[in-house]
Amino acid sequence: MTRMVTESTPSPVTVAPPVPARLYVAGALRLAVAAGIALIFFLPVLWMLSISFKPPAEWLEYPPTLWPKEPLAGNYTFLFNPGNPEGAIAVMTGAAEPVVPAFANSLVVAPLATLLSVTIGFLAAYAVSRFHVGGTFMPFFTLTTRMFPPVAFAVPLLLYYSAVIPRLIPGLRLYDTRLGLILMYVAFTVAFALWMTKGFIDAVPRHIEEAAILDGASRWRVLFTVTVPLVRGGLAATTLFIFILTWTEFLFALIFTQRFAITVPVQVSHYAGAIGRFYGPQAALGILASIPVVVTGYLIQRHLVTGFTFGLVRE
Amino acid sequence: MTDAPPIIRLRHLRKEFDGTIAVADLTLDVAEGEFICFLGPSGCGKTTTLRMIAGLERPTAGEIWLRERRIDPLPPQQRGVGFVFQNYALFWHMSAYDNLAFGLRVRGVSPAEVDARVREVAESLELTPVLRQRASRLDLSAMQRVALGRTLVVQPQVLLLDEPLNNFRPGLREVMRGELKRMQLSLGRTMVYVTHDQEEAMTMGDRVLVMHEGRVEQVATPREIYRRPATLFVAGFIGRPAMNFIETQYQVEDGRAFLRHDALRWEIETRREAVERQAPSGRVIVGIRPEDIRPAVLAVPEGRRGETLPVQVDLVQPLARRKIVDVKVLDLVLKMVVPGTFRVDAGQTLDVVMDRGALHLFDPQTLRAIG
């Protein structure tokens, strides 16, 4: 090598120049506006949190207050032990079963359905994006299936689950089982997974994959060592989206379960009794039910933020 | 060019996509160590040809030979060719090191040897200091070298480059161009370089192959391409501003041969025989480069001086060191180039002469050069 452009070694440290005062003011203003908007979105959550610690007497107070006058953990303990409420929550009789089975169901159904849906959707999207499988109309067609109101499918599917499947495949139970819900959720979310991931795959220049193919890498190797890492931001976003969808799904969970496969959203609807709705335990369950979503979001947020650093040169 | 047997031989290469012909019938020899540029407008088939050599496209017909081996039936990784993509197509999520190592790892080379060969290539391309950096964080020059290094590490006999400088801003392009050319000289590697940028092709290539609508228009040195364009397309495509074309009729007056357009005429006694043989219809397109039409007051060598011609100056576009002047004569608008210091204004008349030795003649039927 004779001569080469030699600015290739980056300077190790860049010292930030002093920030002018007006930028501080602008920054503070921006922060204030952001905080205000965040508060608006966060208000329902705060309200729910507040109610989850309030005794029945304070649930329907008007105007509502943020701080419980007599805070208690009874709403939470009631979720796990609804048998004989005592003290301030003694009025909450004649209701629900313990929350643990519903939580267990949701914790199995939603992640598995999400994983399956994103995997299938991603592979399908790859086939559509790279090999034009199904022609030009196919991707749109998959989406049109989601334009039917789900309730239009619900009853035929219910009959299919309870009357047809048991005859066709004796021993396979889909009604009121986790498997039944998982299959249903995959079928109903895979079109979203396909569409979301397809956009990200389309954004990966084909040439990058061809470069690997030229070296003799198999399609699968290209997929997992080149494409997947480049779209992982998109996969993370899709996963979170589908997880929220399945974790909180209510209609099918209500219709296709009865006792054994009840999920958290259905469980939330079960809190009512002699005194009407049990807002406290509902709020408490709402708080608990939010935790897995928040945790999931937190775990993958690193991937959500990274992702497309290859916008440096346009394709 | 050497007398050694060619390293690449393309024989009657053809590629069709769903009935449209991308490459019609391409035969070419590339010499060892040569830098050959495929030049043409987009869609002319140059990239398709390159991809066929690499094995990314399968030819509809024809053969590709690398030295003594016919490679067109082989999968890409067995062909011994390296490919540098537009925008480099690096594995942006990997380090420079992993980019360089990828091809070796896929081929199952032992880790110790992978390391040795990556370090060797990195050293020769001055990439050692940035090996641990992510590809997406490298500066453009380093990206270019990683893209080259990634292909060099598997020791290809030929490097294929597909518009590697396409999306860089002007200015940077020229820097990168120089850097690439230097690399080619120091590596001594045979390179096939695809571009639609004539300046790039003309400055970098030992030879240039001009393609148009799937066909080879001309293969020659840049100088030859400019001075003796083989077809009307090449004549119009190469050179800025583009060559002027004038439709003329062949005539013999008083025993002397002329090409005539209305009241204009050019004596072509020396090329008479070629015109009569190759353009029997008598219709000839005369091409003349803007730089070969000059103000009469500026010298043209006496023997080659055509007739002085008064023209009307229509438009003057000053550039840094020269001016592009549109002039009208009869029903023609011709472009000419004058030095930046030459004073000329729109509306004035100007006496010009055309360099008779610089006339290019084309047959309007075959679109090929005459003589």
Model-derived segments and spans:
Chain B
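ABC ATPase nucleotide-binding domain helices that frame the ATP-binding cleft
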Residues: T47-L50, V146
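The feature captures the beta-strand-to-loop junction immediately N-terminal to the Walker
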Residues: L39-P41
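ABC ATPase nucleotide-binding domains
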Residues: P76-G82, Q86, L90-F233
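ABC ATPase nucleotide-binding domain
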Residues: R9, D29, W65, D351-V353
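Glycine/charge-rich catalytic "coupling/switch" loops of P-loop NTPases
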Residues: R227, R256-F258, D262-D314, F342-G371
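Conserved ABC transporter NBD signature motif
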Residues: G62-R70
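Helix-to-loop junction immediately C-terminal to a conserved catalytic motif
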Residues: A54
